[in-house]
Amino acid sequence: MKKLITLILFVFSMVAVQAQDSLPDPNIPLDKESKTIKFSGVVHEKGTKNELFNRCVYWLNGYYKSPTRVTQIRDVATGKILGKHSFPLYTFDTVSNTNIKTAKVNYTFTVMFKDGRYKWQIDELEVISNKKVPLEEMINKNDPRYKKEWKSYLTQIADFIKSWSDNLEEKMKPEDAKKEKDDDW
């Protein structure tokens, strides 16, 4: 169901691809020190470091098809989970009136835990179509290699990460908070 919602978000974002130039610039965070793109958030949530770690593992198992292949580090002692994955990017084909998978994005995610809070981060993003393109190159519209579909790609990437982080934050809530929300009808 979660993946279906993410796919629907992608499809709706692709409807706007026809008018790529009219798309607003997506919010892509560039780290000024490292000059790399890093999406991140710190969330205050009830629970110990271990409880938050276990909730995240539960989320991983529901979110990813093969979570053990996705994660490279699952260290309870340090409170860190690190994984690598990818997702598709689409371009709208006006002839067939459909979205066509034209590229994929590789990314690395890290979730770190402390008592009462956790931090998530997505970085090392690279778009792969005919060749690997670091995301940092795609935000420079003055670059002679800039392609007009990159704006659509950046929008899809920002939408994916928003959906990913929203899903993580929802699953990281303690069970009693979820039940209270359900009971308030």
What residues fall within each predicted segment?
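Bacterial Sec-dependent N-terminal signal peptides
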Residues: 1-23
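Ser/Thr-rich, low-complexity intrinsically disordered terminal regions
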Residues: 19-185
